[in-house]
């Protein structure tokens, strides 16, 4: 079925009827206020963003600390609940995941030179020779599971630095379990040869732990700290600065995922430390869409970080483009060529296609941000 886009770009009343599926009976609902509880969500998002930017200055000193929960969001309580859930449901996660829990507990309770000790992990049988051909193609989760099968596989995996040069902890339940100590023990297996480290969602990693890992792996060139909630912008910049001064900094590309808030001065220093340019020309930048950037672990072009200066608010942030060929925002502002390029605070985007949700004050009162085109497609599938 072909979608009539002209009809979808109709009035706000038609949009409310289409979303609610009320047809002619939707007139009674269209008259409802857009913000019945006076929450003023748009201004709240801007206030939160401004607060973070204003309070990032001068936080390098230990005397300056942020409040535990400035907006009463109870983030730490939520994280503790998630962690407790994993502890309580270990038996229901599966055999492979249980092996990973055992392997991770080995990181906590043993040193790297304890390989000769007796253990109950599979006995002393010899593994098939074919495993030597398979191991280089396994991912981290599979390698950790193979390691607890038998003693010979543990020796093969633990004593081969090649298997640990690229460590990806993103999209794994391990990200809620890894601490500074266990991460350091894990990276030591590469004998200082870690090249790529993805810590996406590792909520237990602190500034101190990250500094230890970076200092012990001077050849690490690619780092992702997306979702590392215990890291601070000031601590990260300070770590990179110290390693740079001692000529031990190997990081060339950094992915933040928008989890850290940088001031303009911090963003400029970050680019200098990583050897990049804070003012990358638009012609040198490929388009980035909101839907394809949520869990990516790569950097296109030659940029050193996923952050840019937003053309609207002129603050360092994740900047996205609009995938729509025709957008109502184009031509309405002095910088028409880049009017669809902005951070998610300045321009809210559809969570399904990434297009602009302009004129947010006239949107229905809901938290499921979707454009009318995606709503129409979703209704046709019902």
UniProtKB/Swiss-Prot annotation:
Domain F-box: start-end pairs: 16-105
PROSITE patterns: 4FE4S_FER_1 (PS00198)
Gene3D superfamilies: Ribonuclease Inhibitor
InterPro entries: F-box-like_dom_sf, F-box_LRR-repeat, LRR_dom_sf
PANTHER family, sorted: F-BOX DOMAIN-CONTAINING PROTEIN, MITOCHONDRIAL ATP SYNTHASE COUPLING FACTOR B
Full protein name: F-box protein At3g27290
Biological source species: Arabidopsis thaliana (Mouse-ear cress)
